[in-house]
Amino acid sequence: MITIKTVNTKKELTQFVDFLYDLFDGNPNFVPPLFQDECNCLDKSKNAAFDFCQAEYFLAYNDEGKIVGRVAAIINNKANQRWQQKRVRFGWFDFVDDREVSTKLLQAVEDYGRKNGMEEIVGPLGFTDLDKEGMLTEGFDQLGTMMTSYGAPYYKEHMHAMEGYTVDVRYRETKLMAPKEVPAKYMKVGEMVQKRYNLHVYKPSRWDLIVKGVGRQVFELLNETYKDIYGYNELNSKQINQYIAQYIPFVNPKFITIIRDHNTPEKKMVGFGLSIASLSHALQKTRKGRLLPFGWWHIVKTLFISKKSPIIDLLLIGVLPEYRSKGANALLFTDLIPQYISYGCVWAETQVQLEDNANATSQWGPLDPIVHKRRECYVKTL
């Protein structure tokens, strides 16, 4: 018999996080998240999303008292208000191949939602759009990334057999093969937008990003460019500060490109591309996502010492809608691609993108895109 218990103590929260490492221990494609990042994200006193979110975490135990599953129940009041919905989200959903485990975990989230007046359950989703989204349904033989969750093939089987659940949205992840030079199409469009629209590349330093407020401008632009994407809610000032502190110090400025409109007095920021040398292999060398004793070295080596990176993760790309048709995206790539080539990039990896987001999927054409992973989010009426 499976028993579901609420996470109430720091020890139980550690067990909640550690379950994932144990479940996929030895899997060559599983990329462990950083332990402390996971704990901070789930900690109600540390994650700024709790200014407008509420959550409860559950663990599943078998008869021997062994943990066999976990799930988070999240209510994002800000997103519900923005999209005029009453949804409870489920996330951090991992379990052994036992239908009783997965069913009872989701029932716990459903009960939590009903108790709080929710009308639907949806997931896997996190607190915000920058958390991990979607359940992996294809690409189990592909290396994961630090920004996405892994999963077993039986996860999808459980969800598709679960009573009342249907697919809400589908995502894709794409592998972009690195060219030997910038594709002619990008070069042609990039030159045109500079001459015709007076749009130009700006390369910020880490000082600019952290101290001069350019990093904040990037996330404010993210809010504007992502505002109509499925389930998105704007990041508040406190969240932006957290993301700047969490990500910007570790990003190579060469992999950050900003597009500015020189027709405006302030040279308005209208687009950005933020990427990073893949940390997948470095994270796999940590002990359960811990930086100590030697996990930190593998990450530092990848980010700051090595001059080669065969895989680049495209973390975030955003262009204001009125500038997409002008070719601003192509201008981004004319700057970023030479940087990737100089680091020996073999391919770049996109993060999750909605299958019906034509603006996101159409821009990769000249880079021989290969869709190598797919994900799904599910919804059920309570």
Residue ranges of model-derived segments:
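Extreme N-terminal starter segment of soluble prokaryotic enzymes
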Residues: I2-T3
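A conserved beta-strand-loop-helix scaffold within acyl/acetyltransferase catalytic domains
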Residues: L20-D63, V71-Q81, K203-I317
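Acyltransferase donor/substrate-recognition loop-hinge adjacent to the catalytic core
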Residues: S149-I229
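A structural motif corresponding to the C-terminal lobe/cap of the Radical SAM core domain
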Residues: P366, V371-C377
